[in-house]
UniProtKB/Swiss-Prot annotation:
Subunit structure, interactors included: Homotetramer. Forms an RuvA(8)-RuvB(12)-Holliday junction (HJ) complex. HJ DNA is sandwiched between 2 RuvA tetramers; dsDNA enters through RuvA and exits via RuvB. An RuvB hexamer assembles on each DNA strand where it exits the tetramer. Each RuvB hexamer is contacted by two RuvA subunits (via domain III) on 2 adjacent RuvB subunits; this complex drives branch migration. In the full resolvosome a probable DNA-RuvA(4)-RuvB(12)-RuvC(2) complex forms which resolves the HJ.
GO cellular component, one term: Holliday junction resolvase complex
Pfam families noted in UniProt: HHH_5 (PF14520), RuvA_C (PF07499), RuvA_N (PF01330)
Record region (Flexible linker): 144-152
Gene this chain is encoded by: ruvA
Any one Gene Ontology BP term: DNA repair
Protein name: Holliday junction branch migration complex subunit RuvA
Length: 204
């Protein structure tokens, strides 16, 4: 089991990053909510990881905080929820927000995420209720805008932001509309993604 990787951030192509650990490159899929916490290319990066072995592939999922990985693993225990959906959930809300959603039986918010239908959302509420009952939501770290990284330069940040939304399961028209709705001069890729996701959940 690979539980943690520490190395240099070699590539950043949401939702995937490439971590160079002593000359070995590890491709890791991360929730889009983690983008703002990643360092600049070439700088040191540490990720808590979850290793998945399938017949056709070996996959690594990375998380900035231990509690993100903890919730990811709890989500995988829910019937019908695989790694892709678990990453999508963590891309849209923090562990604290998800816990509040389950405790408040907020079915509507769950169904606003791509790939989460009513039946899946109902299973999440039912099966996760007992699993998160001891989750100390108030004591865990919460993401804040001040922690977000500086904007990534270059003309392709719009395309990269749109590609990240497509990877979550949104349709091209939805992704393009959401990006254009929040885009402003000087805005970086990570902020674009964060605001677009926030807007899509509110308006969907």
């Amino acid at each position: 089991m690979i539980g943690r990787l520490v190395g240099k951030l070699a590539e950043n192509h949401p939702p995937f990053v490439l971590l160079d650990v002593n000359g070995v490159g590890y491709e890791v899929e991360v929730p889009l909510s983690a983008l703002g916490y990643l360092p600049k290319l070439g700088e040191s990066c540490s990720l808590f990881t979850h290793f998945v072995v399938r017949e056709d592939a070996q996959l690594l999922y990375g998380f900035i905080r231990r509690e993100d990985r903890e919730l990811f693993r709890l989500l995988l225990k829910v019937n019908g929820v695989g790694p892709k959906m678990a990453v999508a959930i963590l891309s849209h809300m923090s562990p604290n927000e998800f816990v509040e959603c389950v405790r408040g039986d907020n079915l509507t918010r769950l169904t606003k995420m791509p790939g989460v239908g009513k039946k899946t959302a109902e299973r999440l509420l039912i099966e996760m209720r007992d699993r998160i009952k001891d989750w100390g939501a108030g004591d865990r770290e919460t993401a804040t805008p001040e922690l977000l990284s500086q904007a990534v330069g270059g003309h392709s940040h719009l395309e990269e932001a749109e590609a990240a939304l497509l990877a979550l399961g949104y349709k091209p028209q939805e992704a393009s509309r959401a990006i254009n709705a929040v885009n402003k001069d000087g805005m970086g890729r990570d902020e674009l993604i964060r605001l677009a996701l926030k807007g899509m959940v509110k308006t969907k």
